[in-house]
Amino acid sequence: IDIHNGKVKQIVGGSLMDTGNRATENFVAQQTAAYFAGLYQSKKLVGGHIILLNPVSSEFYEQTKHQAMEALKTYPGGLQIGGGITPENAGEYLEAGASHVIVTSYVFKDGVLHYERLRKMEQAVSKKHLVLDLSCRKRDGSYYIVTDRWQKYTDVVLNEQTIAELSS
């Protein structure tokens, strides 16, 4: 359940722009995020995710967050949440009903993997409630982890060694 500018959307990956709150849209739903959370719940689908696509600095962030919180209330324990998650706010989402928090940009800050930030997230929510998003884009024949709404490449190539290191 991707939420952008307070609406559930399917967007073209990598098209999000922080300036102007713009994205290329494939589809914009008329229903709320809570409606879709209810569908997940009625079909007994667990492990789906909610992604807040607006940064905290966006004028639409509060609308987007409100949609996310309503969805979590609709299906407590059934959905994960990501988008701007930090050790400081992760607990709020878990208390609201998220089963897990999803992080990328916080751990891969400025294109670099920061193990101390990963440890802080783990201390805040425990491994049991933490999902590390390893979304990638291909560059120069390798797949690099990307952050910040798929706009920024990290210096981390996704391979067996990377997965082994991060899972330990």
What is the predicted function of each stretch?
Residues D2, Y40, G48, I81, ...:
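Conserved, mostly hydrophobic/aromatic
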Residues H4, Q10-T19, L94-S168:
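Conserved anion-binding
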Residues A33-Y40, E88-A90, N159-L166:
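Short, charged beta->alpha transition segments
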Residues Y35-I51, A96, S168:
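Catalytic domains of carbohydrate-active enzymes, especially glycoside hydrolases
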Residues Q67-V101:
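Catalytic cores of alpha/beta
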